[in-house]
Amino acid sequence: MTGEDERIEMEIRKRNGKSVPFQQEKIFNAMKKAFDGQGKEIGSREMDEILATVLNNLSVTVPLTVERVQDEVERTLMERGHYEVAKAYILYREKRSALRRVRHTIAQTVGDDTLDEVLRRIQMDFTEEVYSLAALQMKFESFCRPGMTEDERAEALTKAAVELTTAEAPKWEFIAARLLNHSFRCRNAQEWEGRGVCDLYGRLRYLTDKGLYGDYILAHYTHEEIAMAEDFLCPERDELFTYSGLDLLLKRYVIQSRSRVPLETPQEMFLGIALHLAMNEGSDRMGWVKRFYDMLSRMEVTMATPTMSNARKPYHQLSSCFVDTVPDSLDGIYRSLDNFAKVSKFGGGMGMYFGKVRAAGSTI
């Protein structure tokens, strides 16, 4: 096969302006898909010859761009008489261009260039027509008003995805969750950047110093163990959330500042719970941290509300249900009410047994 040297030396300029090493395998795969899509058989020798022609013609092109490569593939296919395949390739190229345009329009309207990659992943994972981003764009634009801030536009985009969720198109709730998560992670990164903190240990130290994190976590784990635990984090597992689930977590369960600003990501929350649950393990403690984290972050198990809320925090009441026997005295009754309030404060459910209290009118 010709073009091997060019593949090593050449670079290609992508649509975002970045230059990356040129990979001829991508051309081969794209042409193979075009032939397969038309049900056309083509021998490996002829495919190699087509690829060699494309590469030889591209070797004189500086700078090399994605559009130039695609133009050359189309021309070579038609020169060799593969008109139906070339037509399918052109239509596929136009479809991809339309997908890019809607992504670009949404990202530009919001004012967030990093949103483009999130939208690209959505297009890859939700290919049914009912989840077309064109529908999201139309709904989003109906919510936009002059003078909206970037955060307000991002919120409107998420709201648009939520409103598109129906019984016939339930996966819009997962799309809405991805949009919400992107907005949250951007704000969260800015919060920590403003505080000059760049790693998990630094974040835990900051939260501990502010009284938001239990000091027992850093007392049980070394700096190196926290760094090891940080490697366990899998941000892509945020994609398992529905919008309602993620929204609830961000509002009620992740650690927040005194001014109600979330300072913990959902994955850091799961890891913090795992660190708490495994801290007294005698052997292979970090292995248990990873096991607990994986079970939680993959949604394989669900912890009780107090565990989700309080593990890793200063007041770590982890149990769900309590029963208190109310004594037959005024002091005892009010002491039970005091216990009820304290348990409820930290998320515990409370039951009260009044069997010891005499009925009204009984003999004293």
Map each language-model feature to its residues.
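Extended catalytic cores of very large enzyme megasubunits
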Residues: 1-364
